[in-house]
Amino acid sequence: MKVRASVRKICKDCRLIRRKRRVMVICSNPKHKQRQG
């Protein structure tokens, strides 16, 4: 899980979602998991 100021999709499988007022990226590749913080 990477914590970044700006999250973006890295590949075509990445999905931008909002969870508990946090913007997150979930993906089939675990290296692409990100959260805004």
Swiss-Prot record:
Signal peptide range: none
Cysteines joined through disulfide linkages: none
GO CC annotations on file: chloroplast; ribonucleoprotein complex; ribosome
Source taxon at top rank: Eukaryota
Keywords noted in UniProt: Chloroplast, Plastid, Ribonucleoprotein, Ribosomal protein
Pfam families with a match to the protein in the record: Ribosomal_L36
Biological-process GO terms, alphabetical: translation
A single GO molecular function term of this UniProt record: structural constituent of ribosome
InterPro entries, A to Z: Ribosomal_bL36, Ribosomal_bL36_sp
Alphabetical list of PROSITE patterns matching this protein: RIBOSOMAL_L36 (PS00828)
Cellular compartment(s): Plastid, Chloroplast
Annotated family: Belongs to the bacterial ribosomal protein bL36 family.
Record protein name field: Large ribosomal subunit protein bL36c
Native source organism of the sequence: Oltmannsiellopsis viridis
